[in-house]
């Protein structure tokens, strides 16, 4: 088992990893956001990758989602814990609350959501966008390590917007009218790509603000960064607990997600495309 972690540098610095080393990974989808750091925690292999780069130089649109997921797959990762900063769409989910969402609404516009195409067509089910087993595991970890002052929410819908601008008030009010729970910029296409790569994937979302639906409320970078920093210790504790308690007999339907989804005969797939997707789909193309 190798557990991938996608998030900010604060997570890597806080996790008590041993025997660490970095690997520079090249992929058919470009360079990842940064090198992959590998180490051990509680006898488990861990691979860490900062989504936005070490110095947060990639916007939510420009983050190297395909290369990042491919890189984690290539170093042996089979499950991924990610972290996100999000705004709250509910009065009862204040800043500094942790949410383990189980649904996504995709409002992104300019991101490639698939590894496939160019001669290979894959239609994959995505009804449960986060791995249900990983959602439960993260929610249990959050319940175990947070105190009475840190609210945690099990389940909920994450609406993913393109960014990098925050929502308009009309957009924020619309999201609330749909009954959605949090709004952020980074879980898509990450969750879709993780499923295509047959990785068990879920996220810990830390609430930084109330978005702009509240009267006279504006989202500012200062507020977001302040609350993101306040959330960091709780998120770190959840991730460490989740890694330490990850069961050896953990099972996920995501690990066979490509089965029966490839709609192109193997002999019709261009050789260059087949080589590009071999790590992801090779066993289904033999």
Task: Label every PLM stretch briefly.
Residues 141-181:
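Active-site/ligand-binding-proximal alpha/beta "capping" segment
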Residues 73-76, 176, 195:
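Non-catalytic positions within long, well-ordered alpha-helices that form the structural scaffold/packing
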């Amino acid at each position: 088992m190798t557990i991938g972690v996608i998030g900010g540098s604060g997570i890597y610095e806080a996790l008590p990893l041993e025997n660490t080393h970095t690997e520079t990974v090249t992929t058919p989808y470009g360079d990842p956001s940064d090198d992959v750091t590998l180490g051990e925690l509680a006898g488990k292999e861990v691979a860490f990758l900062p989504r936005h780069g070490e110095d947060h130089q990639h916007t939510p649109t420009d983050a190297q989602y395909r290369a990042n997921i491919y890189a984690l797959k290539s170093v042996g990762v089979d499950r991924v814990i990610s972290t996100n900063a999000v705004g709250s769409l509910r009065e009862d989910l204040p800043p500094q609350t942790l949410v383990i969402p189980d649904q996504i609404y995709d409002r992104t516009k300019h991101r490639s959501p698939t590894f496939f195409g160019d001669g290979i067509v894959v239609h994959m089910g995505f009804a449960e966008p986060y791995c249900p087993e990983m959602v439960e595991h993260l929610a249990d970890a959050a319940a175990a390590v947070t105190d009475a002052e840190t609210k945690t929410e099990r389940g909920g819908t994450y609406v993913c917007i393109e960014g990098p601008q925050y929502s308009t008030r009309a957009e924020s009010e619309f999201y609330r009218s749909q009954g959605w729970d949090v709004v952020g910029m980074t879980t898509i296409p990450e969750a879709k790509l993780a499923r295509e790569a047959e990785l068990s994937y879920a996220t810990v979302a830390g609430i930084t603000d109330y978005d702009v639906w509240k009267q006279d409320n504006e989202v500012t970078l200062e507020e977001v960064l302040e609350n993101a920093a306040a959330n960091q210790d709780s998120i770190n504790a959840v991730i460490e607990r989740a890694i330490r308690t990850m069961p050896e007999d953990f099972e996920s339907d995501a690990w066979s997600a490509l089965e029966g989804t490839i709609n192109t005969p193997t002999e019709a797939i261009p050789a260059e495309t087949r080589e590009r997707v071999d790590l992801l789909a090779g066993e289904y193309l033999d």
